[in-house]
Amino acid sequence: MINMTKQVSKILAGLFTALFAGSLMASDAPAVGKDLTQAAENIPPAFHNAPRQGELPALNYVNQPPMVPHSVANYQVTKNVNQCLNCHSPENSRLSGATRISPTHFMDRDGKVGSSSSPRRYFCLQCHVSQANVDPIVPNDFKPMKGYGN
């Protein structure tokens, strides 16, 4: 009798597991590749106190990437789309009045200049960052090189 109860318990547990797993498998699969605009990596973090659009902030050292003088909230920069180039590409900068991307952005790792931006320089926000008008979290005693900065 005890053996039979154990067997029935195992069978019932197996049935419930199969039903539960079956219902999970039957549910709709996520729409991969269809609409990724709400994927976690495509939702930008909140950015507060962006400076007003205006002149470029001063550089602090030689070869510093220029800082972005406007908000880039909701800008899409992915392997397929780079919204920065809507204004900053050589063709569009003439119309938009935006700063043209540097010729160095067209060089590959061997120094050869191509007709389009190099993959190494395509993701603008790796180096060029927006600034915010906030108090520093920690004191900063950095002094810009002579001839640079404010």
From Swiss-Prot:
Protein name: Periplasmic nitrate reductase, electron transfer subunit
Post-translational modification: Binds 2 heme C groups per subunit.
Keyword terms, alphabetized: Electron transport, Heme, Iron, Metal-binding, Periplasm, Signal, Transport
Reported function: Electron transfer subunit of the periplasmic nitrate reductase complex NapAB. Receives electrons from the membrane-anchored tetraheme c-type NapC protein and transfers these to NapA subunit, thus allowing electron flow between membrane and periplasm. Essential for periplasmic nitrate reduction with nitrate as the terminal electron acceptor.
Sequence positions that bind heme c 2: 105, 124, 127-128
Family of the protein in this entry: Belongs to the NapB family.
Gene3D superfamilies the UniProt entry points to: Flavocytochrome C3, Chain A
Location within or outside the cell: Periplasm
N-terminal signal peptide: 1-26
Residues reported in the UniProt entry to bind heme c 1: 70, 84, 87-88
Gene Ontology molecular function, alphabetical: metal ion binding; molecular adaptor activity
